[in-house]
């Protein structure tokens, strides 16, 4: 059951989400998108009933919640540190809070209105803070690569950089092999020289190559679609 219009909406576009849904449903798993649960009550044909805002419902014997993260900022809030509107301890580029003697890293820290729900940004913050505590004010936290590579119920899924082409002038190259069940989208710069992001579903064999092009700013070949 997914609240958004598609699965993994942050990582995938509409085409990638549709293919992922198709592959999961082929495994015999029902997928319900655009469903907002309003109440969980006792079921008639199963133990539980999930009631949705569109007045439909789903009965099941077991419900497993996977609802993201919530920053644990109670101590910081009680101590008078600056807290974001939706939670999280506000930090600067050196992981320092509103009190110069207090620092925060990881999923409790709010950097430029962003909470990072992955472990990699926490490691980057830790390195930044370690450098700052050792007198290095040149090293700064400037964000983190949120690229993702995983298997979802056995289905390869990959997302790199600006996967939704939000960069001004960005162009798209799409490959959609319906028979093989492979989808790949490459987001490139307006001049065609830089890979800005990518989406892969069904086949991650190109992921590592595309990731290196995106992270290291490697100039794309004349025909990027050959990657």
Region roles according to the model:
Residues 1-90:
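A Rossmann-like FAD-binding core segment of flavoenzymes
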Residues 18-21, 123, 127, 208-211:
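Generic alpha-helical structural signal
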Residues 25, 29-30, 81, 131-139, ...:
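Generic secondary-structure signature for well-ordered alpha-helical cores
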Residues 42-48, 98-100, 152-153:
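A short, glycine/Asx- and small/polar-enriched loop/turn
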Residues 49-51, 56-131, 222-226:
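FAD-site-proximal beta/loop scaffold in flavoenzymes
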Residues 77, 189, 201-202, 213-216:
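Short beta-strand-to-turn element immediately C-terminal to the catalytic PLP-Schiff-base lysine
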Residues 108-204:
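Mid-to-C-terminal Rossmann-like scaffold of FAD/NAD(P)H-dependent oxidoreductases
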Residues 204-222:
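A short, polar/charged loop-to-alpha-helix boundary motif
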